[in-house]
């Protein structure tokens, strides 16, 4: 079983030595009601994106099912669900199967769900071609028209082979074709009654490339090389070309079918579906410059999801903020946005990442409010030390044993009981961030990951309300 994406615990750790090279963040308050609204006046602005990552492995130990998104009301407040993750093989192809640590077809499309765990209350049968998460996502879309589901490729653990897979034009074409065949066309490997040609057709509405990171060191064993930057640009171009070509072929097939049924006269030709193309991208300017030709890439991306968390992690010797809106001479949401804009990214294609978890330290000394103080190590937690879900941290805050501290000027919060500290985002912090998104004319918000929220989807709701207030 894949573990939770602990990737995001180590991103900042890899790059902390580089933090001094980052340009200073803006002082707090810049852009807040001070003429910071960059949207053109008099034009209707497209709806803000509210994106959540759904983890493939969360259905096991965490028992977080697709149906939980329906019963909590979360699905109705999301625009996109990114399914994490699809893997790329050593042969340079998208693939699935039942291979521990590499693929989990059982969770994806083979596992039967009973009526109680099914989005529409109907249990899976032994003979249907599609079951598992993919079938539940299909049902979730039926209940929530307009909701898009994207397959996210890679992640911290599964970015191993990207660099090798994109070295030539032929290898890029083969990789992209394999991903479209598996996820967009839905041609799943046969697994007993499950799978087959077109079994998952219509489940996915686009592709999210989560290569961590082109041109930069990341997880142990992940290949990277200097030419990743140009190859990544070419890969994204190939995804856009092949997705558009497939959409046009679908539209032609529909037109031919309508014509064959005598509906061809007096009817408009079907408009090709637009498949979204996005990526998860780093906050560290060194990583941006090493792997991302921003101006060229953004022509093909519909949007990118900015790293808005793990600015500091529990493996560090001192406590610090992990997701501040502003920070001086440090990583922050505002600094990340400005670094991408400075390199040519349109503001209306930038989605701000938000955590549904906290980073925590124990053995904190030095007194005061705990922030910026020495610690002995990561705080004990439910699934991995130093990393705890918001739903658990909320209970700590409500218990009275921890005090909630806020830096309202810089937009972040933390819990401290005298020895243990957790830095996290709560609804109050998210309200400040949604105001920032609106003021700056950004594209919206993204959550890593949906299983960390409360049972009633408190964080997703806060962002939905903040982005869509009138």
Task: Please provide the spans of the model-predicted regions.
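Secretory targeting and sorting signals
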Residues: 1-29
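Extracellular low-complexity, Gly/Ser/Thr-rich intrinsically disordered linkers
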Residues: 27, 395-470
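An active-site-proximal structural segment forming one wall of the substrate-binding cleft
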Residues: 168-207, 235-244, 289-302
